[in-house]
Amino acid sequence: MLSKLVVLALSATSALAVSPLGGGTWRSTNPSFNVQTCEGGHVSGSEFSIPAKPSGSSSGGACSNGHTRAERRYTNDYSSGKHQFGGELRINSFGGDRVSVKQTFNGDDGPFFILGVKKNGDLYSVEGGGKTIASGVARVGATVTVNTVHDASAKKYQVYVNGELKFTQSAPGGSFYDKIGTYTTDSGAGPIDVTWSNVGFWTQ
């Protein structure tokens, strides 16, 4: 009986772990990161929160535009090949609307892809004209698995939600890196508190 319980526990753990998607052989990487906050944003481990309004504090090293921010900036910089991010996003509380939870930056040109969440739980592409990626999956209390696959050589970017391909767009050339956390979009506002868990990075 004990052995069966152990097997079940291990199976449950495996089911919860985020895995790379999209086919092919992926090699796991472990990039470091820098914590970036601005205007009252707070990072505690893997939990990210921003207030309803800017606090007036420009400390945190990431306040060039004055938006509220609580993010990790990963040092996974790349300019060619295939690169994948995966993680589980939980919305702990949300009293605002239209907040970024994941960004892929095109070097000094800024983000070319921003994954945003609306108060109704929709995930959407902020930079892609506000196109809905997945409806209602990221409501308060929900956990959603997100994978992004960027083929920098082919200039293609894809987003998987809960294991299903939901969004594909063309990508520019250049150098890239990823951020996760919370960041107020131009049309959005906090407060919001989220947790990113089981985060992984892979390359081909």
Residue ranges and their predicted role:
Residues 87, 141-151, 157-159:
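Short tryptophan-centered beta-strand motifs in secreted/extracellular beta-sheet-rich domains
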Residues 28-50:
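Extracellular glycan-recognition surfaces and repeat-rich motifs
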Residues 113-114, 137-149, 172:
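Flexible, surface-exposed loop/gating regions in the mature catalytic domains
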Residues 42-121:
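Secretory/extracellular carbohydrate-interaction modules
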